[in-house]
Amino acid sequence: MTKSELIERLATQQSHIPAKVVEDAVKEMLEHMASTLAQGERIEIRGFGSFSLHYRAPRTGRNPKTGDKVELEGKYVPHFKPGKELRDRANIYG
């Protein structure tokens, strides 16, 4: 599901709320989550999961075109850990 599809589905389900208001709310929520992570803070949504930053240590990689070794710097990457309820709901398909 894309962001546009999410906005469309929410606007359809909440027909009393104008689609533009739904779109603005979704965009604002995602922007707030991104800025919270950028500040190094953790986000926890009970029953859904948590978002945090994990550190990737420096390592030696390879250029896929040439095969040459490339030194990659350490960096922080976003990480999502699903909550138990989400794992249980997703497991009905497994």
Curated annotation (Swiss-Prot):
| Pfam families in UniProt | Bac_DNA_binding
One Gene Ontology term of the molecular function aspect:
DNA binding
Note the Gene3D superfamilies from the entry.
Answer: IHF-like DNA-binding proteins
Source domain of life: Bacteria
Which GO terms fall under biological process for this protein?
Answer: DNA recombination; regulation of DNA-templated transcription; regulation of translation
Instruction: Kindly give the SUPFAM superfamilies that the UniProt entry links to this protein.
Output: IHF-like DNA-binding proteins (SSF47729)
Question: Could you tell me which CDD domains the record lists for this protein?
Answer: IHF_B
Q: Does the keyword Chloroplast apply?
A: no
Q: Name one GO cellular component term.
A: chromosome
Keywords, in A-Z order = DNA recombination, DNA-binding, Transcription, Transcription regulation, Translation regulation
The family assignment reads:
Belongs to the bacterial histone-like protein family.
What is this protein's function? This protein is one of the two subunits of integration host factor, a specific DNA-binding protein that functions in genetic recombination as well as in transcriptional and translational control.
Q: How does it assemble?
A: Heterodimer of an alpha and a beta chain.
Q: What NCBIfam families does the record tag this protein with?
A: hip, PRK00199.1
The protein's name in its UniProt record: Integration host factor subunit beta
> What species is this protein from?
Escherichia fergusonii (strain ATCC 35469 / DSM 13698 / CCUG 18766 / IAM 14443 / JCM 21226 / LMG 7866 / NBRC 102419 / NCTC 12128 / CDC 0568-73)
Designated gene of the protein = ihfB
